[in-house]
């Protein structure tokens, strides 16, 4: 199912490749097993994820399989425009894109390429908000870690 699984604080990050592209990135529970890269693209993705884990300014250069509705793609493009160390609310993106905050949240949750398409930078108006269609558990801890990693702790008084 996954071509590599990389260790991160609060989670494991799994990558699936297909047809020479990264098809999916998933957050797995922290106790999940690691997996060595199964192919050259998985190796490349693992190296770039590990570099990001150590340096939030690291950039990704991976061929991506991006599939979604026109609105989802607009949301994902807007997420990519959010600079590291910054956040936007679901409502702000909704107003910018001419949609509803709930639809933006749905597009964030449907993002199959998190970290590379940084849905963690989209937050609720009153705090962190959900993550990958979750409102608690390790996925929210993962979002908190990503925001802390990118220096957003002060803005949202995140607690570990």
How would you name each of these model-derived features?
Residues 27-29, 125-128:
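Acidic/polar active-site rim loop that often engages polyanionic ligands
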Residues 112-113:
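C-terminal flanking helix
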Residues 116-124:
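Short Lys/Arg-enriched helix C-cap and helix-to-coil transition segments
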